[in-house]
Amino acid sequence: MSCLFNSLSYFLNYSSNQIRQIICDYLEQNKPLIDGLPTDFILSLDDSNYIKNMRRSSEWGGAIEIQAACNLWNLRIIVHNISGRRRSKIEFLPISNNYVYTIQLTWTGNHYEPLKASEA
């Protein structure tokens, strides 16, 4: 299992595997991740079998899947990077810029953990 999908399932009403498959379906339909760049182009930069591989429970999710989750569920996701000495946070917003819920996760450099959620 992937810690990202497990962390998202903590806040969403879906199992981690359901979230993974919903996100992969979204990517497979070539729906936009970010404004101005086709999703198939973004995925081709990584691996031509990206979605097929991501459907496997052993694959780790990352920024692409976080952005897809934002778009699917109108979420703002804040990832607190707590790896290393320099702490930072990365904010992901849905392509519509309208979100109803904020989810916060921590990233340790190789692991996501759920932190908290709140209304927009």
Residue ranges and their predicted role:
Residues 1, 47-48, 93:
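A generic structural signal for ordered alpha-helices
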Residues 1-38, 73:
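Active-site nucleophile-adjacent alpha helix/oxyanion-hole segment immediately C-terminal to the catalytic cysteine
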Residues 14, 45, 61-64:
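Short coil/turn linker and secondary-structure boundary residues
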Residues 19-26, 37-46, 83-89:
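Short amphipathic alpha-helical segments embedded in low-complexity Lys/Glu-rich regions
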Residues 29-56, 71-75, 79:
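Acidic, glycine-rich loop-and-strand cores that form catalytic or ligand-binding grooves
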Residues 55-120:
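Deubiquitinase catalytic domains
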